[in-house]
Amino acid sequence: MDMSGPSHHKLVVYLNGKFIPKEKAFISVMDRGFLFGDGVYEVFPVYNNNIIGLEPHLNRLQDGLDAINIKNPYSNKKWISLIRKIISLNKHNINHAIYLQISRGCDKKRNHTYEELNPTIYIQSSAIKSVKKDELIKGKSAITREDIRWLKSNTKATSLLANTLYAQEAKESNAEETILYRDGIVTEASSSNVFIVKENFFLSNPSKLNCSKKFLIFIRLNLSSSFDGSLTY
């Protein structure tokens, strides 16, 4: 999803129970998401008002919260209501990437251990930029680097330092993405999935079956293409 490009409209976001202009959204400096990256996030793609893969994304959000021991503050029904409200309040975005973040919350002091806290909940909409056909045909440039991120990358943790550094390295190399590999196997890219469609085979890393990848595999299988194994580096 390409979310680049300036917006001339004022964005409305959701923060801890309130829908407010983005420029008025502030969190405490003692928030553990700010101090430690102690939280999880999820991104819901929305095209023509249709939330793509809603249930799988909500399931992954729950899995992420369970993995870091944060109680889910809302029911799925409540999350869906909030997401749809954000979409309606930001109608200037034709297609949306709905970013939802939950941190463990604010503590009284900076400490690695924690008590049960009230989570900080944030939701925003970013415009998904449409890509022209000639751009797709031309393709994008990429560099490759060894994947040295932590091994629980299926948990969508907010601490994306490694991904940020990989993306910046691509930018400084006049490339648009960094493709990552570990032990000779392609894992993913700094902010993208990686696939190769060769003849009638659909190649990707089967250990990284995230929401978008499952959706694309479903489409390919229904188009009578085969899914076959890992990409090697």
Give a label for each model feature:
Residues 1, 192, 199, 216-221, ...:
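Intrinsic-disorder/low-complexity regions
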Residues 1-177, 182-185, 217, 223, ...:
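Conserved alpha/beta cores of soluble small-molecule-handling proteins
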Residues 185-207, 212:
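Glycine- and Gly-Pro-enriched alpha-helical subdomains that act as flexible
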Residues 212, 224-226, 230-232:
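Low-acidity, Ser/Thr- and Arg-rich intrinsically disordered low-complexity segments
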